[in-house]
Each structure stands twice: as C-alpha cells, then as structure tokens.
Amino acid sequence: MKKITLLVLGIVFSSLNIGSTDAPAELFILESNGIHSYDPLINAIFIHESGGDQFAINELEMAVGPGQVRQCRVDHYNKLMGTSYTLSDFFSFDLTKEMFLYFTCHNGNGNPIPPKTYEKASKDWNGSGPMTITYWNNIKALL
C-alpha cells in the first residue's frame, strides 16, 4: 500500500510542472473519510439524554431512543421530509443522528441554513427557554 501511495504521489507531483507558465495543475482527493464535525456533540447529547441507551424510554415525556425523540418532533420531521417514520423508528442511533443533522442544517420550515454552532444545535435539540442554558452546560461538560 505504501508503494502505491508513493507511486500516486510521484505521478501527481511530476505532473505539477512547477515553474511552468502553463495552466495551473489540478489536485484530486482520491479518498476521503468525510467530515464528521458533529459526531462529538451527537455522542454527548446521546449520553446526556439516554446514557447512550438506544432503547431508552422516558414515559413521562413519551420520548424514546438515544436522543429522546418525542412524537411532535417525528411529526415535524415527517412533514418536512415527506417521510412516514413512527416514534419507534427513533430507537435507531443512525436515524436519530440523521434527524439531528437535518435540524442542525435546516430551519423550522425546512430551508437550508448555515450549520449551527455546537451550543445552538444542542439548545435547539433540547427545546427553548432558560433551561436550555443548563442543558448546554451539561452537554459541554461531556464534550
């Protein structure tokens, strides 16, 4: 693998024509694992909300899963996405993460927005009001 990488790098660098007046060379990313900038925040929220328990249920709030999703959020997500998820679908780490990321990069009407800060994303996940400050402090301590 090392030899292949060196060979590819050699080919790329030899094609750069450093010092040439020709058009600038193009570099390509051959492989990327992607950017997961919200993963630490999502993990902290899941630990805070459910202790990381995928099958957690809060009967008082009727919230389920690792992110403690409630029916009103499922309904809102379904409306914006044109999906028909049920509350029990959100026992899934992946689906809950997908929902979190959607609401982190879209406003309440489903329009794309610039990605939120960790603080704004966590407070919005929690809800609204003064308790979101305490919530953020708890999440921040887990980061």
Model segments located where?
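Sec-dependent N-terminal signal peptides
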Residues: I4-F13
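Signal peptide cleavage region of secreted peptide precursors
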Residues: L16-T21
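Catalytic glycan-binding domains that act on GlcNAc-containing polysaccharides
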Residues: D22-L143
